[in-house]
A protein has these predicted regions:
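Select transmembrane alpha-helical segments in multipass membrane proteins
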Residues: 20-29, 66, 96-108, 193-203, ...
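Membrane-interface "cap" regions at the ends of multi-pass membrane proteins
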Residues: 1-54, 198-203, 215, 222-232
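Transmembrane alpha-helical segments of multi-pass small-molecule transport proteins
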Residues: 100-107, 128-151, 165-173, 198-215, ...
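Helix-loop-helix connectors at the membrane interface of multi-pass transporters/channels
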Residues: 87-91, 118-136, 288-311
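Juxtamembrane transmembrane-helix boundary signature
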Residues: 61-94, 101-109
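Hydrophobic, small-residue-rich membrane helices and short re-entrant helix-turn-helix hairpins
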Residues: 22-24, 151-161, 212-240, 256-259, ...
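Selective recognition of specific alpha-helical transmembrane segments in multi-pass small-molecule
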Residues: 37-40, 65-70, 106-115, 166-176, ...
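Membrane-water interface regions at transmembrane-helix termini and the short interhelical loops
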Residues: 48-50, 75-77, 120-128, 142-163, ...
Length: 311
């Protein structure tokens, strides 16, 4: 049953049919989950450690606008054509072999980000529960994320429905606890506690931290129903993610006088820190692995002439 096979493989090499498209909210929650990640906390803390709050706000604003332009343009292409980023590259000037090269680059890059996020998870869990080595936590986290990614868009959507609100509530409580006792005026007007970052460096840091996610937007928006959905979810997801998470982390960097926001949250939160790390890794790392698999499928199809399953 070709149609069933394509659906179970999340239409890795073909257009997503209209009946398989989703509501904008379903996709928007996952996009927000990508942006409001621990990675964003880390970027914000680095900005806060090296910039004043005002300069960090400007850097986040400029970087966010750049990301939103790229995200919307590629997202609209994804919803109109209904194919993944790597397949879209075939018809966007790269050609078949060029799209295979793009696919390989993306596959390795996202696999690397998967490893980085999993490493942060393993380190944090080891610090909180030292009875197991880091490699064991990395193996457990990787296996859990892989199981979610293998089952495709539907399971990943439900994962986002559960983990995004949980992450925001838990992280919000932890941040409020950490900032308690600090003067809001001092946090907003005080000098950076560490080596100064220039505005250009801060903007590059903001844009560079999520540019790969922005480039992979068609992998997600091919499930949207109309271009306006892409605009809505981008403005909601990227803007709220960058500002709400980024600026909060800037104040954390000022308050704790360190850029190690992972250490701040996990060491001060105990069990809550464990839950924060777990929800943080689940809601973004499944997409790292998912997009990496889509890119690998396209490269195998072009270079080997074999159509392999995304799973």
């Amino acid at each position: 049953r070709p149609g069933h096979d394509e659906a179970s493989d999340d239409y890795s090499l073909t257009r997503v049919p209209e009946e398989a498209r989703r509501s904008w909210f379903s996709v928007a929650v996952q996009r927000f989950g990508q942006v409001s990640s621990f990675q964003q906390f880390m970027v914000g803390a680095v900005l806060g450690y090296g910039m004043t709050f005002t300069d960090a706000l400007i850097a986040i604003t400029v970087g966010s606008v750049m990301l939103e332009v790229v995200t919307i343009l590629l997202g609209v292409a994804g919803v109109r054509e209904g194919v993944s980023t790597s397949v879209l590259a075939r018809w966007s000037g790269f050609g078949r072999k060029g799209s295979a090269a793009v696919g390989l680059l993306v596959a390795f890059s996202l696999a690397g980000w998967f490893g980085v996020q999993n490493g942060v998870f393993a380190q944090g869990m080891h610090d909180l529960a030292g009875w197991a080595p880091e490699w064991a936590w990395a193996l457990l986290g990787g296996a859990l994320v892989t199981a979610i990614s293998v089952h495709g868009f539907t399971v990943m959507a439900w994962t986002a429905y559960l983990t995004v609100p949980a992450f925001l509530l838990l992280a919000g409580w932890s941040v409020a606890d950490t900032l308690a006792g600090h003067s809001l005026h001092d946090l907003l007007t005080g000098p950076p506690p560490g080596p100064v970052l220039s505005l250009a460096e801060g903007t590059t840091l903001v844009a560079g931290a999520f540019i790969l996610g922005a480039l992979m937007t068609p992998d997600m928006t091919r499930f949207n129903r109309r271009p306006s959905d892409v605009v809505k979810q981008t403005l909601l997801g990227v803007t709220l993610g960058e500002y709400a998470i980024g600026l909060t982390a800037v104040m954390l960097g000022h308050a704790a006088r360190t850029a190690d926001v992972v250490g701040i949250i996990t060491t001060s939160s105990g069990l809550w820190g464990t839950l924060i790390l777990t929800t943080a890794i689940l809601k973004i790392n499944d997409w790292n692995l998912y997009s990496s698999a889509l890119a690998a499928v396209n490269s195998a199809d072009v270079l080997l002439g074999r159509r392999i399953s995304r799973r």
